[in-house]
Structures are given as C-alpha cells and as structure tokens.
Curated annotation (Swiss-Prot):
Name of protein: Large ribosomal subunit protein uL14
GO cellular component entries: cytosolic large ribosomal subunit
Function description: Binds to 23S rRNA. Forms part of two intersubunit bridges in the 70S ribosome.
InterPro entries linked: Ribosomal_uL14, Ribosomal_uL14_bac-type, Ribosomal_uL14_CS, Ribosomal_uL14_sf
Pfam families on file: Ribosomal_L14
Assembly: Part of the 50S ribosomal subunit. Forms a cluster with proteins L3 and L19. In the 70S ribosome, L14 and L19 interact and together make contacts with the 16S rRNA in bridges B5 and B8.
Record-level GO BP terms: translation
PROSITE patterns the UniProt entry points to: RIBOSOMAL_L14
Recorded family membership: Belongs to the universal ribosomal protein uL14 family.
One Gene Ontology MF term: structural constituent of ribosome
Protein keywords: Ribonucleoprotein, Ribosomal protein, RNA-binding, rRNA-binding
Length: 122
C-alpha cells in the first residue's frame, strides 16, 4: 500500500533508481496503490547514461510493497521494499530486464510481459 509522494525503487534497467508517486490512477478518490496498480511517477534519482532522466513524469506499475497483502488462498505476501516497473502507454515495460521478485497478481491485471522478464514470480 503506497500513496502520494511515496518513494519507490525502480526494478528495471531504464536508468531510474528512485521515483516519487504523483498520482494513483483509477477513480478520483483513490488514495492508495496496491500490487498491480498504475501510478504516475516523477523520476527523483537516475544514472546519467540511462533511458530516462531526472524530473521526467512517467507511468509505472507497482510490483512489490512492504505492506502485506492477503491472497484468496489465505497466504500473506510481503516484500522487503516498495518497487515499481516503468511502463509505456500500452502497458509494456520500458526496460528490457526486471530485477528482483514480482508478485503473481500482475498476471490478473494483464502484465504478462513483465512476468516473463522477471527473475522470480512469487
């Protein structure tokens, strides 16, 4: 569960290291983003030779959260950090590699390309 101005680690190779959430997309009253939600982010920290630059405004999908999430089978899912993957308008990832584990809930939201690039799906 992440909200406005939360800092997220970036789990891909676009060159961004950290981003800050500007807006949680969805309904007008949506305050928090969970696994698989799309958010509008601003790049806060990036490497100089990367695809994206500091200050750029992009879309991202949440792939890991510290706040635990209950699954329908009763298991509880919790990660060590809050992380996202930068995406294009057509839901495809901007980078070519995904670092770290990602949640299986992304499959239900239609992010199969992110799951195929991920090292580990939990």
């Amino acid at each position: 569960m992440v909200s406005f101005m939360t800092r997220l680690n970036v789990a891909d190779n676009t060159g961004a290291k950290q981003v800050g959430i500007i807006k949680v997309l969805g309904s007008t009253r949506k305050r928090y983003a969970f696994l698989g939600d799309v958010v509008v982010v601003s790049v806060k920290d990036a490497i100089p030779s990367g695809m994206v630059k500091k200050g750029q405004v992009l879309r991202a999908v949440i792939v890991r959260t510290k706040k635990g999430q209950q699954r329908k089978d009763g298991t509880h899912l919790k990660f060590d950090d809050n992380a996202c993957v930068l995406i294009k308008e057509d839901k495809s990832p901007r980078g070519t590699r995904i670092f770290g584990p990602v949640a299986r809930e992304l499959r239900e939201r239609g992010y199969n390309k992110i799951l195929s690039l991920a090292v580990e799906v939990v």
